[in-house]
Swiss-Prot record:
NCBIfam families: NAPRTase, PRK05321.1. Transmembrane segments: none annotated. HAMAP family: NAPRTase. Pathway: Cofactor biosynthesis; NAD(+) biosynthesis; nicotinate D-ribonucleotide from nicotinate: step 1/1. It is an enzyme of class 6 (ligase). The lineage of its organism: Bacteria, Pseudomonadati, Pseudomonadota, Gammaproteobacteria, Enterobacterales. GO terms for molecular function: nicotinate phosphoribosyltransferase activity. It comes from the Bacteria. The keyword Nucleus does not apply. GO terms for cellular component: cytosol. Transiently phosphorylated on a His residue during the reaction cycle. Phosphorylation strongly increases the affinity for substrates and increases the rate of nicotinate D-ribonucleotide production. Dephosphorylation regenerates the low-affinity form of the enzyme, leading to product release. It comes from Escherichia coli O157:H7. Catalyzes the synthesis of beta-nicotinate D-ribonucleotide from nicotinate and 5-phospho-D-ribose 1-phosphate at the expense of ATP. This is Nicotinate phosphoribosyltransferase. GO terms for biological process: NAD biosynthetic process via the salvage pathway.
Amino acid sequence: MTQFASPVLHSLLDTDAYKLHMQQAVFHHYYDVHVAAEFRCRGDDLLGIYADAIREQVQAMQHLRLQDDEYQWLSALPFFKADYLNWLREFRFNPEQVTVSNDNGKLDIRLSGPWREVILWEVPLLAVISEMVHRYRSPQADVAQALDTLESKLVDFSALTAGLDMSRFHLMDFGTRRRFSREVQETIVKRLQQESWFVGTSNYDLARRLSLTPMGTQAHEWFQAHQQISPDLANSQRAALAAWLEEYPDQLGIALTDCITMDAFLRDFGVEFASRYQGLRHDSGDPVEWGEKAIAHYEKLEIDPQSKTLVFSDNLDLRKAVELYRHFSSRVQLSFGIGTRLTCDIPQVKPLNIVIKLVECNGKPVAKLSDSPGKTICHDKAFVRALRKAFDLPHIKKAS
């Protein structure tokens, strides 16, 4: 499988914004921390046959570097510091940190190395996997089909929102990691730019080239790594929240809630954190139940929910976003991040449900115990038990 050997990626910034935000925080706070991460396909797809093609793309990624115009653009943003950007200018992907193999038909990928470097692999590598697989599986699919599908959905969206005050509806593109292709994502984002409710993209390359607002704060790995960085497991989530505020005291203040379930998060999210963070992001579990819990928590702390933002980003499409908007729009500020249902929405194309998640920090296990049992990831069952005990979690959920 070498007929598509041309590089999929053309820019170091073709990644999610929160990767650079987290990388800067790691650079400043945890320079010597080492991590390991693993690829998971949550579906039944046997992707091992694409291992050689993916490995070839991994090798090509070492040639990506921050260009001068990209450096200047990042320098103009308010939250990046000069020491980090100067280091990023010299950064190169190291393919030796990545092993790719075909394990009896399953695609096996493991990453390991300094966290400050490994952190940048996840999103572009997932985008590479998605695009390579779709090139082979769906050679007939093209950008025009993706755009036609979007236009049809926008017609439905207009009908669905007729007569509804949409002034508080804000949509973001979160579609880099599972996109059909780089070209499809750019075409979809350009079309969405024509809509008044479209406010930005998580992709830094697209944000720069299309003059969009880059969107994103932190991911699960920030909280997972603190499970081993923090000397006290029960305090690890608070330590992660506090360290983020050290790096970004009054910016990038949307906190992800489901690394160790929403209930455990809210127990740690006291009045100081709730006041300083601008809002919360939903990524697993029932979104209405989650939103009601968030609003009730703010009210209990005597914080006006109208001053905070809830970001919904779990398996959304336009219809689901409108349903959530109808339910919550009068009580709290809202944003919606849609990924796969925008950038890999083509007839007869099956999107991949793929992730890369942290499994170790400094040689010790870390875990994600989200509000959706199927999203739990950890090899070490004893550590999962310890984590559940530390955070007083009920109901044992199977770790995968």
